[in-house]
């Protein structure tokens, strides 16, 4: 009887160790994946902010007051986006929560607004933007599209990871339940014959 109790404790300890190991591996995976993606997003946001500053400094002589206001608005949005990425990086362990999902949606919306702004500037500024400014607008539009694609990929990957993790844990729990049930049956047979 003592041997059976020891076996039960050993199996419970083994299950607890496996759960702890799975939890550690999951946290490590999330940490590495999130760090790389947030580093890429932060770099893109910094490049956008640098572009706005450069465009504002070199375009004072031919940008209208309306275009100046739009540049200021876009620069403010880029700064907000950079601040969001820094905040998301600092709280990466919680990025799969509902709050992080909402922030990802907010960042995607801001990226779409930036893309719409670039398209509007390109359409309304053909008569006074130089060839250099046109090239910079195209570069910024490409960066905004890449940033939008990154956010969509991050959201899809997060959902796929959550689904795969949930399936794996469900299968593992089912297997452990069946193993425990068989052990109890064997225990019953060994005690009562």
Curated annotation (Swiss-Prot):
Keywords: Gas vesicle, Repeat. Sequence repeats lie at residues 19-51, 52-84, 85-117, 118-150, 151-183. InterPro entries: Gas-vesicle_GvpC, Gas_vesicle_C_repeat. GO terms for biological process: gas vesicle organization. It is found in: Gas vesicle. GO terms for cellular component: gas vesicle. Residues 19-183 are annotated as: 5 X 33 AA tandem repeats. The keyword Repeat applies. Can be used as an oxygen carrier in mammalian cell culture; addition of 1.8% GVs in the medium enhanced the maximum glucose utilization rate by about 30%. The GVs have both GvpA and GvpC. Induction: Gas vesicles are abundant in low light, and collapse after exposure to high light. Belongs to the gas vesicle GvpC family. The tandem repeats probably bind across adjacent GvpA ribs with each repeat contacting 5 GvpA subunits, stiffening the vesicle. Confers stability, involved in shaping gas vesicles (GV), hollow, gas-filled proteinaceous nanostructures. During planktonic growth they allow positioning of the organism at a favorable depth for light or nutrient acquisition. The ratio of GvpA:GvpC is estimated to be 25:1. GvpC strengthens the GV wall, probably by connecting several GvpA proteins in the same and/or adjacent ribs. Removal of GvpC by SDS reduces the critical collapse pressure (CCP) of stored gas vesicles from 0.23 Mpa to 0.08 MPa. Protein sequence was derived from constitutive gas vesicle producer strain CCAP 1403/13f, DNA sequence from CCAP 1403/13d, a spontaneous mutant which does not produce gas vesicles. This is Gas vesicle protein C. It comes from Dolichospermum flosaquae (Anabaena flos-aquae). The lineage of its organism: Bacteria, Bacillati, Cyanobacteriota, Cyanophyceae, Nostocales. The gene is gvpC.
């Amino acid at each position: 009887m003592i041997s059976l109790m020891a076996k039960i404790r050993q199996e419970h300890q083994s299950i607890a160790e496996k759960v702890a190991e799975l939890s550690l591996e999951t946290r490590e995976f999330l940490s590495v994946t999130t760090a790389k993606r947030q580093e890429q997003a932060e770099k893109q946001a910094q490049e956008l902010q640098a572009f706005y500053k450069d465009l504002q400094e070199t375009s004072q002589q031919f940008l209208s007051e309306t275009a100046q206001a739009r540049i200021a608005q876009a620069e403010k949005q880029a700064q907000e986006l950079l601040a969001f990425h820094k905040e998301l990086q600092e709280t990466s362990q919680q990025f799969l929560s509902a709050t992080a999902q909402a922030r990802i949606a907010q960042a995607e919306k801001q990226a779409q607004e930036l893309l719409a702004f670039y398209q509007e500037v390109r359409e309304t500024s053909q008569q006074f933007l130089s060839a250099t400014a046109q090239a910079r607008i195209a570069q910024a539009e490409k960066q905004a599209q890449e940033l939008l694609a990154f956010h969509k990929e991050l959201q899809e990957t997060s959902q796929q990871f959550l689904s795969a993790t949930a399936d794996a844990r469900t299968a593992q729990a089912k297997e452990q339940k069946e193993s425990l049930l068989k052990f109890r049956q064997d225990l019953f047979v060994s005690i009562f014959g």
